Every structure is written in C-alpha cells, then in structure tokens.
C-alpha cells in the first residue's frame, strides 16, 4: 500500500530551511520504521527564498510612498514568505519584492480571497499606482548620486 504526503516549507533563512528538511526526513523515516514501513522522502525546490535587501528596502520606502501617496505604503509585517521566481534575480543582485494592494474598497484584506484562488477579484483602479511605483523607482534610482 502506497500513501503520499506533500506540503510546503517556507522559511526566512536558507540554513534554517536546510536544517528543517534534514529533521523532517529523519522524523518521517522514524515514524515509518515505528510502524514497520518504509518512506521515500524527496524535496522539490520550486523557488528560492525571496529576500528583500534591507538597504534597498529602506531606500525604496519613500519612493513607494511618493508614488502611492502618504500613508498608503504598508511594510510587510510580519514578513511574508512569497515563493517567486523573482528570488533567482535576488540571488544575483540586491532586489525588493513588493505587493500592490488591490483589495476592493470596503473589503477587509485579511479576509479577502488570496491571489491564485478562484475568488480573487482585484480592484483594477490600483493599476496606475503600480505603474507609477515602477516608473518612480526607475527614475529615482537613476537620479541617485
């Protein structure tokens, strides 16, 4: 009889992730052995850790506020564990990944349908803010001394 168990493991630290993977494999092997079974453990790495460079994040915060308006920029607190292919770029050069809030007016973002779900319904009126944020980031970056 074959059974499969799958899940997602996201951490803010690569060494911590590697340690958790080793510990998970050992725990799974021990549980299987305790029941007279065997286990095949494998990891499929879909995307690397998305890590925002602290100095670049600090530099970018006022630029985003300039683009979005005072009081409209919310730092990710607590940090989020997004898994994006953008992280591969961040492995080569410093980068910042940010979200453009698109929850409908009057809807609580904490209870709104998440991205990539059938109920996701973005307020498209925020798209110009996203364009402005990208353009202002490029302009301000080129204006740096």
Regions found by a protein language model. Give the residues of each.
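Metal-dependent amide/peptide-bond hydrolase catalytic core
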Residues: 2-145
């Amino acid at each position: 009889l074959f059974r499969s168990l799958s899940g997602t493991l996201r951490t803010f630290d690569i060494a911590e992730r590697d340690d958790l993977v080793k510990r998970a494999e050992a725990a799974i092997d021990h549980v299987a052995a305790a029941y007279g079974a065997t286990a095949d453990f494998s990891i499929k790495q879909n995307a690397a850790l998305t890590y925002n460079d602290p100095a670049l994040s600090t530099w970018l915060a006022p630029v985003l506020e300039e683009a979005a308006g005072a009081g409209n920029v919310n730092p990710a607190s607590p940090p989020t564990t997004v898994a994006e292919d953008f992280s591969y770029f961040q492995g080569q050069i410093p980068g910042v990944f940010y979200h453009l809030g698109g929850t409908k007016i009057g809807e609580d973002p904490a209870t709104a349908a998440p991205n990539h779900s059938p109920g996701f319904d973005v307020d498209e009126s925020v798209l110009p803010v996203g364009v402005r944020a990208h353009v202002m980031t490029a302009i301000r970056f080129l204006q740096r001394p």
